[in-house]
Amino acid sequence: MAATTPLYDTYLRAPLRFERGEGVWLIAEDGTRYLDFAAGVAVNSLGHAHPHLVEALKAQADKVWHLSNLYEIAGQESLARRLTQVTFADRVFFTNSGAEALECAIKTARRYHFAKGHVEKFHVITFEGAFHGRTLATIAAGGQQKYIEGFGPKAPGFYQVPFGDIGAVKNAINEETAAILVEPIQGEGGIRTASKEFMQGLRELCDEFGLLLILDEVQSGVGRTGKLFAHEWAGIKPDIMAVAKGIGGGFPLGACLATEAAAAGMVAGTHGSTYGGNPLAMAVGNAVLDVVLAEGFLDQVREVALVFRQGLASLKDRFPDVIEEIRGDGLMLGIKAKVPSADLLKAIRAEKLLVVPAGENVLRLLPPLITTPAEAREGLARLERAAEAVSGKSGNAAA
């Protein structure tokens, strides 16, 4: 069959084309308005066309776009300093994506042990259901066969244990183990939240056995759970953390953050990125932090998250034949469906609401952090109509 497009057939795209965005709304080419609770898969943290981000990007575009890391870039120094001031980290390496940030995190952990003379320590313990990216290393780290199949031998040095099972983690540690890599909330895996006790247990195991704790906060970070980073809810600090998505507010940007000790092996020439930390990305990243770190912003995220949580709980009670479970924290939420999630997704899209599929028959709600309580209630009303259409039942309006 002749191809109808010159594009790779790697995406199952919805038959929708959007012309522009305004806040939490996307406007299709035919003028139809969609309430966007997908946010580019948790990327558009401040919605679409946020004026402060637009202004920052335009101002930088008039100056210089790209320099490479042959030279100092003022925006990198500024953004890195701000990130280290509000996190555990002392050092930052900028990337263009989450997968690149994870690659840097893995390399940082392995170099840490190499620099100490422990060349045998390069194995990383990861978790079943994880998703860390699409590079050869990160699909091996995720361990899901559907992403590994057909790409040759799995990259060595990764092994998976059940998510949330601290005993299995301890049993997997041996003389070759370098680090533990975990998502505080598994996104692609179905919005599965690690308990505080599990996160604390991982930190304790790393301290006990001399391992590095790597957190993948690509999806859960930058305010999405109501804290700047999700691990803060557990009261722990990692050694290395991968960040992306929301930090760029829609512009390609990622970062690997590390303590001084963890980053000690990453000397000149050990890693690099042609585009990483480019002036345009740095301008937008700094603008995102201007908003997210403003006084009261995360309080507002937590307030609107409560509206969602209460409304979704009501929908679950009213439509038990459609909704099995509500998952997640803050504005990283999941609806585990009893019906096929594809059927519920179709009904939701018919209500001009955008959400994101995930594993375990789950649909993700990842609204922009600027979503208001009124917009949250509008989205819940659309979810109610979708659930009603799938269930065939009627009832009172959702909260």
Curated annotation (Swiss-Prot):
GO BP field: L-arginine biosynthetic process
Biochemical pathway: Amino-acid biosynthesis; L-arginine biosynthesis; N(2)-acetyl-L-ornithine from L-glutamate: step 4/4
Cofactor mode of binding and number, as noted: Binds 1 pyridoxal phosphate per subunit.
Cofactor: pyridoxal 5'-phosphate
Species of origin: Rhizobium meliloti (strain 1021) (Ensifer meliloti)
Family the entry assigns: Belongs to the class-III pyridoxal-phosphate-dependent aminotransferase family. ArgD subfamily.
Domain of life, source organism: Bacteria
CDD domains hit by this protein: OAT_like
Other comment: May also have succinyldiaminopimelate aminotransferase activity, thus carrying out the corresponding step in lysine biosynthesis.
Quaternary data: Homodimer.
Signal peptide: none
NCBIfam families linked: argD, PRK01278.1
Top-level EC class as recorded in UniProt: transferase
Binding annotation for N(2)-acetyl-L-ornithine: 134, 273
SUPFAM superfamilies: PLP-dependent transferases
GO MF annotation: an example: identical protein binding
List of residues binding pyridoxal 5'-phosphate: 98-99, 131, 216-219, 274
Main location: cytoplasm
Name of the protein this chain belongs to: Acetylornithine aminotransferase
CC annotations in GO: cytoplasm
Subcellular location: Cytoplasm
Reactions listed under catalytic activity: N(2)-acetyl-L-ornithine + 2-oxoglutarate = N-acetyl-L-glutamate 5-semialdehyde + L-glutamate
Annotated keywords: Amino-acid biosynthesis, Aminotransferase, Arginine biosynthesis, Cytoplasm, Pyridoxal phosphate, Transferase
Enzyme Commission number(s) from the entry: 2.6.1.11
